[in-house]
Amino acid sequence: MSFRCLLVALAVVAAPSVAVAESYEVVGDSIGVGIDWAAKVPSHARNSVAICNGWVLQQLLEPPRGATVFMSLGTNDAVGGALNVKQQVDKIVSTAAAQELRLVWIGPPCVLKPWNENVKKLDAILREQLQGKGVTYVTMSDPSLCDRSLRAGDGVHFNMAGYTRMWQRAAAAAGVPIVLAAKTASEPVVHHIRKTASKKSYKNRHVAHIAATTKGSSPN
């Protein structure tokens, strides 16, 4: 090895490592759309996504490998009483693992509806099934989220304060640092975020979310 090559090699070894910014993204149903309003990260969430219909599998192919993915999923299954989800859950977990994603599963939240009992049952099923699977499961079925001051008029979705509460809980469970704006607690910002979502896409998601809330066919 020449003296010049040796110097180059030593310089590479001695160079300090550069920290790579971690990527955070949101997938899942329209509750996930709302959570993204608070998180302000790239989102692939959309209306009517459920465990049983498998649409989230395509969403999980979108984030970059190694990203931390916050996935809101289960509400559209609870509304119809679809509780036999073991096979679909295993497929979701394996898809995330194949993409080397760190999956943070945000469970179905408490709802102001008669089918809230299904929410509780599905939440328990998911917590049990995901144990030891390398997934961070964040329960949202507790009564504190049924506070009407946090909810939209349909009793299923949330207002900005509610989505912020959910995001704060999910971020804390995942160990993701958030900073609350000084003037309001409704706009948390994640450090080192790979922001790719445009204002236009944000507006389109907002319109679609509101339309789904008013139609009342599928909760999200």
Question: What feature does the model see in each segment?
Answer:
Residues 5-16:
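Bacterial N-terminal signal peptides
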Residues 17-21:
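Sec/Tat signal peptide C-region and signal peptidase I cleavage site
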Residues 22-91, 112-120:
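Conserved SGNH/GDSL esterase-like catalytic core that processes O-acyl groups on lipids
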Residues 98-102:
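A short helix->loop->beta-strand "cap" motif at the edges of active sites that frequently abuts
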Residues 93-97:
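Surface-exposed amphipathic alpha-helices with a cationic face
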